């Protein structure tokens, strides 16, 4: 698969470099305890090598880095579960904490969607987002994604948060449920098709 370099107004989406893991490790941590699983501690050389290899050798995955015009690493885009026969895939995006709420994610998604439909010639793009992540959901809706369903996934096993006992989380407990020893979190499934994008692309991601 050809790995693209895509330029926008404020960002460049490019192939992943092995040095990107060290850049990521220098990001400021997410202060919200619900997102602390995004924060990475120190990694050994072997762990860094595996991180890079896992993301660059999988034929069903296209893992890309996002830079700003100053060359700072802002985050990553990932197209995965690539199904060439049915012309569909899923995607995810992750930004460093200090680069959120600045419009970078919206611009990156806009660029990705254009490349995905016009250059890759795919027809459907899917994503899953935690239902409590209202900021991300709003961004995806701006970019033309629509709800298609709801599912529950295991809460990150690295988390030691007491969702049902800690009063800090009383307002978001509705997004979680307990099944045996597992805590599950609600995810919204969303998608955009090429037809949806062509119909409304002039009004999206502004």
Model-derived regions: residue spans:
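A short, well-structured alpha-helix characteristic of acyl/acetyltransferase catalytic modules
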Residues: 1-42, 46, 183-206
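Acetyl-CoA-dependent GNAT
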Residues: 41-100, 183-184, 191-197, 201-206
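Long, contiguous binding/interaction regions
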Residues: 112, 119, 159, 187, ...
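Conserved acetyl-CoA-binding loop of GNAT-fold acetyltransferases
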Residues: 141-151
